[in-house]
Amino acid sequence: MKKMIYDSLKVLKKVTKRFEIIMVDDGCPEKSGSIAKKLTKKFKNIKVIFHKKNLGYGAALKTGLKYSRSQWIFQTDGDAEYDVNDLLRLIRLTDKSDLIITYRYKKKYNTSRIIISWIYNIILRFLFLTNFKDISTGSRLIKKDIMKKIKLNSNSPFIGAELAIRSKHQGLKVNELGIHTYPRTFGSGSSVSFKNILLTIKDMIKLFLIIKK
């Protein structure tokens, strides 16, 4: 995680002089919390927010959005699965976007995860009449103002899909950019755990019922 933060600092300095990095520790049992604390002491523009217990991927994202003060928010996971240098490509689309989501050029995962992701995206296209290529990636660029127009309810990994779907249904400009992904260098993925799959399905059904009213 430390390497990813240093990489992020390098990239952000190329983009703007005024920025902040917000890390949300969602009750993580690993050493990310102590690493984050050390980094906040070294860099004034880094802050860490702790959840006392694990509230879920979606809850962590909502916390980050709540405390962000910037006009544009680049959200990415802390396991280095995504290249923070993609931000340099994402910002080229800001003039014509309210939200920029990403899709994977090639999915470097095991077969079961690829199948789950494929089925997931097919279901979302069918239920919500969207044509997104891949709505489940954890890297996106969000215009802060859109949070005044949409309310996110999901605490599960469905949060990314909810953000894109609600934005689209509100008539906001949502664009996509292809990216490469890499093997995790920190932590372990939990999005495809049985518990998170059930929570994702639950949040998906809730959003479907809300939108179809």
How would you describe each model-predicted region?
Residues 6-7, 17, 23, 33-35, ...:
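Terminal low-complexity segments of carbohydrate-biosynthetic enzymes
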Residues 25-33, 80:
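A conserved acidic beta->alpha catalytic loop
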Residues 19, 33-67:
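Conserved donor nucleotide-binding strand/loop of the catalytic core
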Residues 146-150, 156-173:
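A short, conserved alpha-helix in the catalytic core of glycosyltransferases
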Residues 51-67, 72-74, 81-157, 182-207:
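Acceptor/aglycone-binding surface of glycosyltransferases and processive sugar-polymer synthases
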Residues 4, 32, 61, 85-87, ...:
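Acidic donor-diphosphate engagement hotspot in glycosyltransferases and nucleotidyltransferases
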Residues 2-3, 30-34, 59, 134:
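Residue-level preference for short helical/loop micro-motifs built around acidic side chains
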Residues 1-12:
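Short, well-formed alpha-helical segments that are part of the catalytic scaffolds
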